[in-house]
Amino acid sequence: MKSHYFLILLFTFSSYFMQAQSDPNFPVQVKIESGMIEGNYDNRTGLQTYLGVPFAQAPIGDLRWKAPQALNSWTGVKITKQFGPRPVQAEVFGDMYSRSAGMSEDCLYLNVWTPANRDTKGLPVLVYFYGGGFIAGDASETRY
């Protein structure tokens, strides 16, 4: 009986460590106009992802209802591995699933997926504005 417990324990720990070592992502950094950002490289897809990259100052306080203002530069490395917050709104559709970091008026973020093996020439760019009629949705939702 004791050997069964030992085998179960051994299997549990070995499964955990095998899963931890099989993580296909590793960090990648790139310099943009405002500073350095760090995203992930996915070995399975060959894509670099940068999620929640700010593109303007937060539209709060004196900046509320104003045109977007240029982003201030930062020092150090900004981690961009999670979707930014979604706009303040209700999830009106029952099948909505958001992967964002909560809700906020500060929701001016981009998500970038780029091939890691790209040449130095320009690549086609797709800009996608998700639906929702200004009442629902965000860039982290899987349907978009």
Regions found by a protein language model. Give the residues of each.
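Bacterial Sec-dependent N-terminal signal peptides
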Residues: M1-N25
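Non-catalytic accessory segments of hydrolases
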Residues: Q21-Y144
